[in-house]
Amino acid sequence: MSKSARNRTRRNPDGQQGSARSFDFAEYLRTETVGGMVLLAAAALALVLANSPAEELYRTVRDFTVGPHFLHLDLTIGEWAKDGLLAIFFFVAGLELKRELVVGELADRKTATLPVVAALGGMVVPAVLAFAIGHGAPGAHAAWAIPVATDIAFALGVLSLTGSWMPTAARVFLLSLAVVDDLGAIVVIAVLFTSGLSVLALLAAAALCAVYWYAQKRRITTPFLYVPLAVATWIAVHSSGIHATIAGVALGLLTRVRRDLHETASPAMRLEHRLQPWSAGLIVPVFALFAAGVPVDGEALVAMTHDRVAIAVVVGLVVGKLVGIFGSSYLAVKIGIGAKPRGLRWRDLSALAMLGGVGFTVSLLIAELSLEGAAAERAKAAVLIASALASLLAAVMLLRRGRKVRNGDASA
């Protein structure tokens, strides 16, 4: 084969060759900027539909129930998107996180410790701030949990649109932080707001995860084992009362990431390569389409300015996340238990900390579980405003910093 012919071909992680000059729609969807644009477009469409004459049709479709009742899976379309489809996104996130922990940016112990410490700070500080501001107000005893969450899909979407110039370490830090943060939020929901937690279902899920790990260890590759196993694990986690997306994270982290000598790519790399376009181009946008459709009530927006709980949510997400994530990261590095990711400056970490304030869907869920009636509506409005404000501030910080970097400003 001539050199020019070799340049026209490439080999993907599945070992297949394709033309480098032909348009590859899957590769197009793997582009982070494209995925971010599709995600935000879907979220914008959802907000328009939920606040337009089409609101009733939108709500009818979102709330349409489908699924087998005998498995307790008679869920609405919106719930299938939130609990089912999003589990695949979390599986891809788990694959990426496992790869970074074993052979990537997080292989160093101190570098891996930093996002965990940052996530803990990003949960504790917003919760303390929200509790202090809302103390004594109706619902404040439970509403402190609302700003502890970070919406991983939307935070990564904003980063992909405005911070594509940043090194890989930035995405890895935010991904790791958000995964730990979401796991923390799931624990909060399970402990405080779940009445029917099933230990038997949790044990079944743990046993299925053990089978998955053993199959990986034995180098079994057939999808006829893994697909039913993954579905069964998801059903078990869902039946336990815990947010079912944790099944995706668990299986992703249990997938083998080192390739054997006879393999062109590891199972984790192959799965990530195959699922990434579906995750970015379909799964996350569909999730956003049904999750972001929150009616924006003018009266609720006005009323929230006089509601201490709503104010506590905004301050917790916008200020608490920034202070908690950045402050705990700074302390961890200074006392030597964490290491700043390669290629990132403190101002970069401050922008990533600001992205942690994009609570959105997880915070909306906690608001729904912890409050009722008008108080819940005001808290939801506060989550929307806080998430939008955090996104905007982070975008401005990233774009300004990116412009300086591209212009070769040494002090950037």
Curated annotation (Swiss-Prot):
Q: Which UniProt keywords apply?
A: Antiport, Cell membrane, Ion transport, Membrane, Sodium, Sodium transport, Transmembrane, Transmembrane helix, Transport
One Gene Ontology CC term in the entry: plasma membrane
Write down the InterPro entries for this protein, in alphabetical order: Na/H_antiporter_dom_sf (IPR023171), NhaA (IPR004670)
What is catalysed by this protein?
Na(+)(in) + 2 H(+)(out) = Na(+)(out) + 2 H(+)(in)
Q: Extract the GO molecular function terms from the UniProt entry.
A: sodium:proton antiporter activity
Q: Which Pfam families does the UniProt record give?
A: Na_H_antiport_1 (PF06965)
Q: Please indicate if the UniProt record lists Metal-binding as a keyword.
A: no
What is the protein's known function? Na(+)/H(+) antiporter that extrudes sodium in exchange for external protons.
Q: What is this protein called?
A: Na(+)/H(+) antiporter NhaA 1
Organism expressing this protein natively? Saccharopolyspora erythraea (strain ATCC 11635 / DSM 40517 / JCM 4748 / NBRC 13426 / NCIMB 8594 / NRRL 2338)
Annotated gene:
nhaA1
